[in-house]
């Protein structure tokens, strides 16, 4: 393509990224964690998925199994937490709602990142406004964020990295307009750290002599496209200041929804597997109703540990007569599918369900052979159950078949309370009456 057609972008795209998000969520409600090394673990308390800066400084890598750092944990008194996804999801919603007050154009990119269009601002105004965003998010939610601003999404990612890694920028960095200054910055960014460059592509690029972002920017498109396709070409142009990735202000409808968990301990009985599959199906149905979607088919899968002998895995996909998001209908089909693929004599490590063929609940296709099908009563029941669980906490009302004790359930030995979503776990602030009187006295 003629380069004259590729115009430099004059947009001002800000990437707001929450700093050490999972750890920051824990610190909001437990200030004693400030300044201490903290790690958050993956499902079943297996591996490190989030680290405080203090933990990073100790050399603990992302994804390291917890058993490999037991000595370091004891030696440095590292605080260990299980993943509290309900808390993190709620805090994420609060951060994103705060960002929406600063711009009508916000793309929620992930649980802890968002792109915001600030193109109506320029120069010092941008720095001041970004600093205001940063201060307000922290005041309203307690979550520290970094802000990187640039003409394209990819350069905004680079700018955010600089804002986060260099304290002198006070959490805000504006990509310079001078191409020479941009190139100087890009020369210090490893190709491994560029947004959209995975392990395989980075390995190939390094073998080709492309080790940093500047070298990638200067690589001809004809060399990139055969290996990395149109995605690689867009990335290349974004590094050159040509905006190829628009903000996605409306999330794309999901094509599938999966709920699966590894078990705390191996499960060998059909009864316990039914409890797990029923639990996962219930959660998946809740997600569908929240997304206002219905599933046309459901896939059930089970598997044993890959690291043990006698490995077994199986799955089955069953269609629904009419696309549905109603828990009883989905449970019936899921249990039938499980019974068809279950095999005695195995110790299963994981089970899950995948809702497929998702479609909007208001335009789902009917079934010519089910003219008497009427889901009105079930829909009202689901709506009532959802409202009760939303008000009083998840699983206030649940299906008896999902079990009570659930010895197979996910290991979460260091789980923090549901501070923001469960009435019984809301933190209590204690203050003496004398302190109140002293405060009144100060006012007058």
What do the predicted segments below correspond to?
Residues 335-391, 395:
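C-terminal hydrophobic structural anchor segments
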Residues 115-119, 315-321, 365-370:
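Short, hydrophobic beta-strand segments
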Residues 109-113, 150-153, 293-297, 346-350:
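Short Gly/Ser/Thr- and Asp/Glu-enriched loop/turn motifs at secondary-structure junctions
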Residues 155, 308-309, 360-362, 405-407:
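Flexible loop/turn segments at secondary-structure boundaries
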Residues 1-237, 246-247, 286, 375-444:
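Gly/Gly-Pro- and Ser/Thr-rich, intrinsically disordered tail segments characteristic of DNA damage-repair
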Residues 34-36, 76, 143, 294-296, ...:
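A generic structural signal for short beta-strands and their flanking turns/coil linkers
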């Amino acid at each position: 393509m003629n380069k004259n057609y590729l115009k430099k972008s004059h947009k001002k795209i800000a990437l707001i990224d929450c700093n050490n998000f999972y750890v920051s969520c824990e610190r909001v409600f437990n200030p004693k964690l400030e300044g201490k090394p903290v790690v958050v673990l993956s499902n079943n308390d297996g591996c490190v998925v989030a680290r405080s800066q203090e933990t990073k400084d100790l050399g603990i890598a992302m994804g390291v199994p917890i058993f490999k750092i037991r000595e370091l944990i004891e030696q440095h008194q590292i605080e260990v937490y299980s993943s509290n996804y309900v808390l993190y999801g709620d805090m994420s919603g609060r951060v994103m709602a705060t960002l929406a007050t600063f711009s009508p154009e916000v793309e929620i990119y992930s649980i802890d990142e968002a792109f915001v269009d600030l193109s109506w601002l320029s120069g010092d105004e941008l720095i001041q406004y970004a600093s205001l965003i940063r201060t307000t998010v922290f005041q309203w939610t307690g979550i520290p964020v970094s802000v990187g601003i640039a003409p394209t999404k990819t350069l905004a990612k680079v700018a955010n990295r600089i804002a986060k890694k260099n304290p002198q920028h006070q959490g805000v960095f504006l990509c310079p307009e001078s191409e020479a200054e941009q190139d100087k910055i890009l020369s210090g960014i490893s190709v491994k750290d560029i947004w959209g460059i995975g392990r395989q592509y980075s390995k190939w690029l390094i073998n080709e002599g492309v080790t940093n972002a500047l070298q990638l920017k200067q690589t001809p498109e004809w060399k990139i496209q055969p290996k990395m396709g149109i995605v690689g070409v867009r990335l290349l142009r974004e590094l050159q200041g040509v905006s190829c990735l628009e903000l996605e202000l409306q999330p794309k409808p999901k094509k599938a929804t999966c709920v699966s968990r590894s078990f705390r301990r191996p499960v060998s009985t059909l009864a316990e597997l039914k409890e797990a599959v029923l639990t996962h199906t219930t959660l998946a149905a809740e997600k569908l109703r929240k997304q206002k979607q219905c599933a046309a088919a459901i896939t059930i899968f089970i598997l044993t540990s890959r690291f043990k002998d006698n490995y077994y895995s199986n799955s089955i996909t069953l269609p629904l007569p009419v696309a549905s998001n109603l828990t009883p209908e989905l449970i019936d089909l899921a249990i039938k599918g499980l019974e068809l693929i279950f095999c005695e004599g195995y110790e299963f490590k994981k089970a899950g369900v995948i809702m497929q063929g998702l479609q909007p609940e208001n335009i789902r296709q009917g079934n010519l052979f089910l003219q008497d099908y009427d889901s009105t009563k079930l829909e009202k029941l689901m709506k009532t159950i959802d409202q009760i669980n939303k008000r009083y906490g998840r699983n206030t009302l649940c299906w008896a078949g999902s079990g009570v004790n659930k010895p197979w359930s996910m290991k979460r030995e260091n789980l923090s309370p549901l501070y923001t979503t469960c009435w019984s776990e809301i933190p209590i602030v204690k203050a003496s009456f004398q302190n109140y009187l002293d405060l009144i006295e100060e006012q007058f």
